[in-house]
């Protein structure tokens, strides 16, 4: 998500009723090459907004809960959530709820160890900030803002942006980008979360600006002892995602599907006809918790796209939601 500054009681027991997914006999490995089908644009922004973008999605009680950034005609950013809906066809008619604070480039998840929902975002009172809630469907039911990360990065025109969070059995990890060809990581013991990761981070990937631009996401791959990272890149035909894998969240990352001609997701393999860009979004997770678990047997990707003829200032581009479904 690029920005040039001129960017009650749902969990009483901690038990989840998740959206039904097809039952499979065995776990699936990640494919070596990806091919998708795509929906068209699933919703238009309500009056006053030019775009809905930077999606974070969980499935809870058989419904999607989606948070997103918004922009207006002047390039000002805000944030919103959708009213819940059970399948993607319901997104168009779901309510669009403006938030009283700006949670730009949000990450939404349920932190199971402390039975609390967490919403993390950028451009608050610290480099990254978070709020907590017992009811993630209520766009304006969040706690006061707390610092998530207080560090700074160098060699970046935007500073640290596009955070994501993920946990294993012992630690929580913060990953983020900087529109500068680098992906960064910080960590803390899981017992200290939610809290402030502090000021220190390390570079875990380094490449050209175009190859590692923004919108990093990290997931646990169900049944595979593996983690998947996706990063948005700038290509000759639009935005696309490159993928990397690791066997430890604290370890090194190996390129997986990283070319524009054979990406994780992009114009070359998305199946989308309404957009050339496959941009900032979230893979659909198997549960809402901090493990950020995905199932390659049933993989979908909520992304932002736009009409290829739309141009001008990035911050006023007409981004809309779409969903990719992996061909198995």
Curated annotation (Swiss-Prot):
Subcellular location: Secreted
GO terms (BP aspect): L-arabinose metabolic process; xylan catabolic process
Keywords, comma-separated and alphabetical: Carbohydrate metabolism, Glycosidase, Hydrolase, Polysaccharide degradation, Secreted, Signal, Xylan degradation
The protein's Enzyme Commission number: 3.2.1.55
Signal peptide, first to last residue: 1-26
Assigned GO CC terms: extracellular region
InterPro entries found in the cross-reference section: GH62_arabinosidase (IPR005193), Glyco_hydro_beta-prop_sf (IPR023296)
Family membership noted in the UniProt record: Belongs to the glycosyl hydrolase 62 family.
Function: Alpha-L-arabinofuranosidase involved in the hydrolysis of xylan, a major structural heterogeneous polysaccharide found in plant biomass representing the second most abundant polysaccharide in the biosphere, after cellulose. Debranches beta-cellulose by removing 1,3 monosubstituted arabinose.
Protein name: Alpha-L-arabinofuranosidase C
Gene name for this UniProt entry: ABF62C
């Amino acid at each position: 998500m690029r920005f040039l500054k001129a960017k009650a009681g749902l969990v009483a027991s901690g038990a989840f009723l998740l959206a039904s997914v097809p039952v499979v006999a065995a776990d699936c490995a990640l494919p070596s090459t990806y091919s998708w089908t795509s929906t068209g644009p699933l919703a238009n922004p309500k009056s006053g907004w030019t775009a809905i973008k930077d999606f974070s999605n969980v499935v809870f009680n058989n419904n999607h809960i989606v948070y997103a950034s918004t922009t207006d005609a002047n390039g000002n950013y805000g944030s919103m959530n959708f009213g819940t809906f059970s399948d993607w066809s319901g997104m168009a008619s779901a309510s669009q709820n403006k938030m009283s604070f700006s949670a730009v480039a949000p990450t939404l998840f349920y932190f199971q160890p402390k039975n609390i929902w967490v919403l993390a975002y950028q451009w608050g009172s610290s480099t990254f900030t978070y709020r907590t809630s017992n009811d993630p469907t209520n766009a304006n039911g969040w706690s006061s803002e707390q610092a998530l990360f207080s560090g700074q990065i160098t060699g970046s025109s935007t500073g640290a942006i596009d955070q994501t969070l993920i946990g294993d059995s012992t630690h929580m990890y913060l990953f983020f980008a900087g529109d500068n060809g680098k992906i960064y990581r910080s960590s803390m013991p899981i017992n200290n979360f939610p809290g402030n990761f502090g000021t220190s981070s390390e570079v875990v990937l380094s490449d050209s600006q175009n190859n590692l631009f923004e919108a990093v996401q990290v997931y646990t791959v169900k049944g595979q002892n593996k983690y998947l990272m996706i990063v948005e890149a700038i290509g000759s035909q639009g935005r696309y995602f490159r993928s990397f894998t690791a066997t430890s969240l604290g370890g090194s990352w190996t390129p997986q599907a990283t070319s524009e001609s054979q990406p994780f997701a992009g114009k070359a393999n998305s199946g989308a006809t309404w957009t050339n860009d496959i941009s900032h979004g979230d893979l659909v997770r198997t549960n809402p918790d901090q493990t950020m678990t995905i199932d390659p047997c049933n993989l979908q990707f909520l992304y932002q796209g736009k009409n290829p003829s739309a141009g001008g200032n990035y911050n006023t581009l007409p981004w809309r939601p779409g969903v990719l479904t992996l061909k198995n």
